[in-house]
Amino acid sequence: MKNIIVTGGAGFIGSNFVHYVINNHPDIHVTVLDKLTYAGNRENLSGLPEDRFELVVGDIADAELVDKLVSKTDAVVHYAAESHNDNSLKDPYPFLHTNIIGTYALIEACRKYDVRYHHVSTDEVYGDLPLREDLPGKGEGVGEKFTAETPYNPSSPYSSTKAGSDLLVKAWVRSFGLKATISNCSNNYGPYQHIEKFIPRQITNILSGITPKLYGEGKNVRDWIHTEDHSSAVWTILTKGRIGETYLIGADGEEDNKTVIELILELMGKDKNAYEHVNDRA
């Protein structure tokens, strides 16, 4: 494998993967295909060697462009997605266009040219798990964990389109022999993350003198994983994974939102209770 395409490679998680590949695998040339929406940024790719990397600005739903690029590559790693839950409730169409139609264009091209395909997805396709205190036996903290056998139960236009794209890939593997793998990862944090996301939003608010807001009681639990660990896992799946398999990526880093906000405040030299409780979002 000498050439790979990384869709969404100018976004948060995708750009971290591009840096990971360039830094750790000197024989690989990376082509980034990115629409450069508000979540994508050329600066995320600054400093990369020009002979190892190319940025193509375009839409993954552009079948002609995708066909041209895929015909010249050895593998596609598909990160590109509309991923903001709140935005999906306001206008679902971009999520259908990118997450469903875009995925279709990519897997069709990979099928046509017999190109290896890895599909990066999210644990949000599984919906919400109950906290331990809501399960028989009581107690506090994390309850069940997702497994590869957990049924899909998406709860928003975003997560439903990601679930739909996962199922498209599974169908193309079974129906057409697509050489594909899927990974569903938990919440990422790390460099280049957009300020709309939970951790950078709290940090930015504190730096700006704005009191961080905690929705509800802050009991929502997320498993947090650093993007470097996620990138390493995706590369391992791409190069060693079994075709047709789905891999769950996590870090056993479960923390509730309240704990995360308090930790950020303490690390930034503030009173850990210097946040504001607001009504939970519907």
Go through each PLM region and give its residues.
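Hydrophobic alpha-helix immediately C-terminal to the catalytic Tyr-X-X-X-Lys motif of short-chain
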Residues: 164, 168, 172, 202, ...
